[in-house]
Amino acid sequence: VPPIWLMQQAGRYLPEYRALRAEKGGFLDLVYDSEAAAEVTLQPIRRFNFDGSILFSDILVVPYAMGQKLWFETGEGPRLSPLMDKTKLADLKSDETRLTAIYDTVRKVRAALPDETTFLGFAGSPWTIATYMVNGRGSRDQSETRRFAYADEKKFGKLIDAITDITIDYLCGQIE
């Protein structure tokens, strides 16, 4: 039988999450505080005894690890620093130290979870990450990203390859 878990099972519907977020500040303050992120990951397991637990993090830790500035606008969601020169997108390099807190969270959750509880890591798809990196925010139609992809397939392909490489490393880091 596959484990039962819910997308976004940790989060704002839980009063204990809201209290911890108020204490810590913003969303990214929770994500990059391994103690707090582990606590948020474990909250729904304690409350509902789900079969599976999903890592509390965000897909945008990947572009952050690639050097883009990341922040959240209240009421509007995530933002990434604009990439003015798309020719340099594929030159972004991974800084694994920007993922250390996430890996610490994984270790803390693994140590605290009951043996019978499945633990799921995750990462965003390269296309989804690319849309945020190019647009600097979420986009309903991804028009800016599609324009870039069609206008310069080679450069866009390099961007996708760079995102794919760090995503593979990131997922392997979650497993290790």
Predicted feature descriptions by range:
Residues 1-65:
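N-terminal basic, low-complexity leaders that serve as flexible interaction/assembly modules and, when applicable
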Residues 46, 175-176:
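Non-catalytic positions within long, well-ordered alpha-helices that form the structural scaffold/packing
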Residues 64-67, 109:
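Pocket-flanking alpha-helical
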Residues 71-173:
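Active-site-proximal, glycine-rich beta->alpha crossover segments in alpha/beta enzymes
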Residues 12, 68, 125:
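Gly/Ser/Thr-rich helix-start
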